[in-house]
């Protein structure tokens, strides 16, 4: 809600980072992040996707307030300084994890993501199972980064990709092959077919 996101955004807008707010299934980026997007050290396909799929806003806080919108998720991308350390990442991470109302995870390439503490992929899987009338123990989830931990733990079978982080592999029931070696297909063949 606005009371939760306003102080967080006020802090983030003072940092030298790229950020996206996801609202109603669409991505919005503060106009000042146009420059930081060019500095990101992610594959060009990801950078192009970030740049071309976001609506740029002159004043994101005003946009949220005037339209009474709820931010579903924020993604933050960091770029490296000359010494290779990610500019502002540790400062931002400490700020975010100190807030018990949100959950902060790493979703890949130099990024952090946060949502409300009660909103994660695991909650989503349990809700979907409930809607479909499926026992959560009869579900399988596959992931590779920290933002997949909740769904891997919620699923009846949690599968880590071969290229997953060590934390994901440690919590998974099974480790499949990598994403470049059809790991999802291998897991489906192993458990379902």
Predicted region positions:
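Conserved acidic, metal-coordinating active-site core of Asp-based
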Residues: 7, 11, 15-17, 22-142
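Glycine/small-residue-rich loop that forms an oxyanion/phosphate-binding "nest" at active or ligand-binding sites
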Residues: 1-6
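Mg2+-dependent phosphoryl-transfer enzymes with acidic/Ser/Thr/Gly-rich catalytic loops
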Residues: 97, 112-193
